[in-house]
Amino acid sequence: GAEAVGRCMRLFDGARVPLAAIDIPELAQRNVAALFEEANRGLAFLSLGEADSLLTITYGGELYLARRIEVSARTLAEAEGERRQVLVERLVLELQRTLDNFDRQYNFISVVRLVLASEQPADWLLAALGENLYVPVQAMDLAAVADFPALPELKNPQRQAQGLLAIGAALREGGP
């Protein structure tokens, strides 16, 4: 955590490269999730990365929960048959447990849906999550909430997911 950030800052200081800010993935994802929030409603946002997954729950633009899940987009895409089914069941169970615990701890926040961002094609996963979770599940589509005319490649959901952290960092308020 703080030690890793400190090491990174010292490297930049040593190279005389000024840093205006350092973002962490959880806050970058929060910034993107805020684009999909509904007023007075909580939003679960699951990003499937190449190494693992990050689940965040936001409300009013604030991050209330962040959790890493050891299931990656690549692992799911490469798995077949029974192995894929086991991974999906594990992911569903982790999501259900987290949503249930969140509901108990923050009963004043109603999580109304889960947005899924995946670096791999995941229509089949979207359907599986939708069948097994008690909240509606939708694919992240930044084109529905933002306009990127200078970046036509961001019309592709997988490219959006690949650039999720950079996009989230660019959306940070309060400075560079």
Q: What residue spans do the PLM features occupy?
A:
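Hydrophobic/aromatic-enriched cytosolic interaction surfaces used to assemble or bind macromolecules
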Residues: 1-176
